């Protein structure tokens, strides 16, 4: 019985790994990220279940990271970070007075960084360029926006201030709506100006995101075009 369970578990891990290592997984991740970045904020504003959905989706994205690499070291780091993240979320949503909101989001940022690194590795492996790889580049861009939103949550939780202007922040998960909006506006260098950075750390984060937003497409597109032309 134990051997049977172990065999089934190993098979499940192999199946998940073969899916997340394949190019087709880029599309699945894109759908998950579009939901997390563009659709969820709308759901969070109109429904009480939005926060739970957001947490489930965020954890699902990071969970997929465990299976998106063959490197044992990266699998271990992803799995450990995911486990800590999940535990801290469960503690916060459980019936107890404990909450590690800042630590939780710091772990979330570390998780996002590892996942971005894993995705960049997937993107440039075996020097092939196809539609899926372009989708993969979009995924990394959206992951940067997500990371920016988590960083804003940390700044706000640690300092009590982050964004000013046409915005009311509650200090809870609901603030994600404003943070992802500001993060995307900074990353795309649009900067609508209705919401703006108040303290220095938020200002530096906004300019850092803008710098990434300008450099990332230039570097990644140049690399993909270079690979495509060298193959032809």
Question: What positions do the PLM features span?
Answer:
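Membrane-embedded alpha-helical segments in integral membrane proteins
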Residues: 11, 30-44, 60-63, 85-93
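N-terminal membrane topogenic signal
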Residues: 14-30
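Short, hydrophobic transmembrane alpha-helix segments
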Residues: 38-51, 65-73, 94-95
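Outer-pore turret/helix-boundary of cation channels
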Residues: 43-46, 56, 147-181
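Structural signature of hydrophobic alpha-helical transmembrane segments
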Residues: 44-58, 101-111, 177-180
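Cytoplasmic-side transmembrane-helix entry/capping segments in multi-pass membrane proteins
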Residues: 73-84, 101-109, 131-139
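Pore-domain transmembrane helices of cation channels
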Residues: 115-161
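Pore domain of cation channels
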Residues: 174-231
């Amino acid at each position: 019985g134990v051997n049977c369970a172990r065999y089934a578990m190993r098979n499940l891990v192999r199946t998940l790994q073969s899916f997340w290592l394949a190019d087709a997984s880029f599309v699945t991740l894109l759908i998950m990220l579009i939901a997390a970045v563009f659709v969820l904020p709308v759901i969070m504003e109109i429904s009480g279940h939005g926060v739970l959905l957001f947490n489930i989706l965020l954890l699902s994205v990071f969970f997929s990271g465990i299976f998106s690499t063959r490197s044992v070291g990266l699998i271990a780091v992803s799995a450990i970070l995911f486990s800590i993240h999940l535990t801290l979320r469960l503690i916060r949503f459980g019936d107890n007075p404990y909450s590690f909101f800042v630590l939780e989001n710091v772990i979330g940022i570390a998780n996002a960084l590892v996942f971005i690194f894993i995705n960049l590795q997937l993107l440039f492996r075996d020097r092939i360029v196809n539609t899926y790889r372009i989708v993969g580049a979009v995924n990394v861009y959206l992951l940067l926006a997500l990371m920016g939103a988590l960083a804003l949550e940390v700044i706000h939780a640690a300092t009590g201030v982050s964004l000013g202007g046409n915005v009311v922040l509650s200090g809870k998960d609901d603030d994600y709506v404003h943070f992802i909006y500001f993060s995307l506006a900074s990353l795309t260098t649009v900067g609508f100006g209705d919401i703006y950075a108040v303290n220095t750390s938020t200002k530096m984060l906004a300019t850092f995101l803008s710098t990434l937003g300008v450099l990332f497409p230039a570097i990644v597109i140049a690399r993909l075009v270079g690979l495509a032309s060298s193959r032809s």
